[in-house]
Amino acid sequence: MSLEVSHLSFAYSKRGRLVLDDISFSVKKGDLLAVLGPNGVGKSTMFRCILGFLRDYEGSIRLNGLEIKSLDHREIAKHVAYIPQSTYPVFNYTVLDVVLMGLTNQLNLLAAPNQDHIDEAYAAMESLGIAHLRNAGYGEISGGERQLTLIARALVQKAKILIMDEPTANLDYGNQFRVMCRISDLARDGYIIILSTHNPDHAFLYANRTLMIYGGKVIADGTPENVLDAKLIKVVYGVDVNVEDYRYGSRRHKLCVPINGGVGKHR
């Protein structure tokens, strides 16, 4: 399984500004790619191009060597799943119902899931630690549990490339940690993960690749340890930080520590 984006450019109108300008990168089995950049730089637009929702782009997006434009949405859904930010539902479906919605690309119109499908849904929920919530209302569980439910839905879809738009947005610290650990586990299991985040520490802690987008262009691409430094973060986010090494036993990570700009303890 592979995804290659080459010289991708996109504007929402023929005379409009380029939202994406000559974006190129590739991912392979087991990659966890963290896409960083300030609001409005085109991260979500890039995801919509990869998912086949926007097709009037220049350049190429190749899924296993096939141009995305040549594939219909059902075919794309066999390989690529989208996990949005956790949202509150209009109707309070059960967690199991939401997970089973991942079967849409596999069932004919008006067909119902069978017991094998339900068993697959249970297995996906079990792998993410939420099987005990199967009969709970989706609107009644925590934000972190809702996010894990959406990931389980993607697993039932049987896609091996998971596109995640800020998967920890609006989650508290504990739920951010739990969700990111599960996502990291999926990459180790061979899934390709592409996620957007506004937190450089998520890239340091969980990703093996990072892509920094600024002004519609890729300005950094590589391992987080090699490309994320204080100078780059200052340029992109306007925040002065120290990028420091953190060691705990045999584990070693880098972390961002803000050093000015009004940061301090309230007394």
Role assignments for model-derived ranges:
Residues L51:
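Helix-to-loop junction immediately C-terminal to a conserved catalytic motif
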Residues L100, Q115-L133, K158:
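Conserved ABC ATPase "signature" region
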Residues G59-E67, I76:
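Conserved ABC transporter NBD signature motif
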Residues V236-R267:
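ABC ATPase nucleotide-binding domains
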Residues G137-I141, E145:
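Conserved ABC ATPase signature
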Residues L36-P38:
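The feature captures the beta-strand-to-loop junction immediately N-terminal to the Walker
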Residues L162-E166:
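Catalytic Walker B motif of ABC-type/P-loop ATPase nucleotide-binding domains
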